[in-house]
């Protein structure tokens, strides 16, 4: 069983909603010690960074990721949030729990974990990291505020990975 999967979701074409995509690219650079960036092919599905860490990216969480989650000891979910959450960066432990959604295409991290637990009898220890977004226009650029928060999130993730090694 691998140690970590880091799951990012959000729309990189909508400004700060792409913060997870930015962080995953930075993780590849940090952990691979190169300027390698995710390619279009690698943007869907699981990408192996090293023997302990994989990353996954999509526009939204999908039920199929539950099968993958069952193969890891730890999971970190990355997403953007709006001003409805007061913290600029929220880091919180999440547990398997089905959460009903008014949208048929929307799953929460807790619901994905619950599916993994119910179907595959294992869900990883999981953390949700959400980063405050300030602009969500059509753009592939992060706002300065969100970029700074993304770098803080990257430091937090690296510390979590290093603690388990």
Summary of predicted features, one role per range:
Residues 137:
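Glycine-rich phosphate/diphosphate-binding loops and the adjacent beta-loop-alpha structural elements
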């Amino acid at each position: 069983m691998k140690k970590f999967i880091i799951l990012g979701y959000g729309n990189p074409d909508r400004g700060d909603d792409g913060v997870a995509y930015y962080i995953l690219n930075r993780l590849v650079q940090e952990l691979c010690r190169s300027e390698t960036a995710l390619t279009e092919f690698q943007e869907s599905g699981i990408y192996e960074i090293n023997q302990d860490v994989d990353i996954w990216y999509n526009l939204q969480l999908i039920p199929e990721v539950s099968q993958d989650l069952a193969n890891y000891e730890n999971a970190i979910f990355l997403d953007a949030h709006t001003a409805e959450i007061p913290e600029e960066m929220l880091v919180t432990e999440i547990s398997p729990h089905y959460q009903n959604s008014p949208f048929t295409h929307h799953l929460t991290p807790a619901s994905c974990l619950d599916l993994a637990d119910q179907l595959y009898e294992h869900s990883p220890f999981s953390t949700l990291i959400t980063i405050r977004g300030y602009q969500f226009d059509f753009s592939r650029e992060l706002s300065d505020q969100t970029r700074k928060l993304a770098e803080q999130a990257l430091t937090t993730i690296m510390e979590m990975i290093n603690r388990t090694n």
